Regions:
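Active-site-proximal alpha-helix that buttresses catalytic centers in soluble enzyme cores
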Residues: 2-84, 107, 121, 125-128
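Generic beta-sheet signal
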Residues: 3, 95-102
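MPN/JAMM (Mov34/JAB) isopeptidase/deubiquitinase module and associated MPN-bearing subunits/adaptors
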Residues: 34-37, 146-151
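Alpha-helical structural signal in soluble globular domains
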Residues: 60-65, 89, 113, 117
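Extended, charge-rich low-complexity interaction segments
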Residues: 104-113
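Domain-level recognition of soluble alpha/beta enzyme cores
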Residues: 115-144, 150
Length: 153
């Protein structure tokens, strides 16, 4: 199974409610560039943070790559969520290609946890970065990092 991690594109500056920040034009361009790397992937499930910028990223990416399935908005993919709790939630997703659209520091910590069982040294993920993890199942130290790509915008 492959777990694909996509950080949202560049967003408007911090506001009173972080969850309401939206993608900027640069952020949309970043997502479109990331989509070029993912056009050949057929995602079985797409999960997104409920934050606006992540939902916009998931919508734009899925439209760009022709993904016709639903985007599942889950409350446990926010920047503050705990890696072990997210790992437990993901345990039930036995699919070939799973895409998570979320935030730092969660995605970097999740990648480190799944590949090294270490949360202290999170994987660096700029806006619209894409990481691919692969393993037989989701668990601490049970996956391998197959790729990490950063946009150049």
């Amino acid at each position: 199974m492959k777990v694909w991690l996509l950080r949202h594109g560049a967003a408007t500056p911090y506001q009173q409610h972080d969850a309401e920040r939206q993608l900027t034009e640069q952020g949309r361009l970043q997502v479109l560039q990331a989509a070029q790397w993912l056009t050949a992937i057929k995602f079985d499930r797409v999960l997104s943070s409920p934050y606006i910028r992540a939902r916009q990223t998931a919508d734009l990416l899925c439209t760009s790559i022709g993904h016709t399935g639903t985007i599942e908005i889950v409350p446990w993919l926010t920047p503050e969520d705990e890696v072990r709790a997210v790992t437990r939630k993901l345990d039930g997703y036995a699919v070939e290609n799973l895409l998570l659209v979320a935030h730092q520091p969660l995605l970097g910590a999740l990648a480190s946890w799944l590949t090294d069982a270490d949360r202290a040294h999170g994987l660096p993920m700029d806006t619209a970065s894409v990481a691919c993890l692969e393993g037989d199942f989701i668990g601490a130290g049970m996956m391998q990092l197959r790729s990490l790509q950063h946009v150049d915008l």
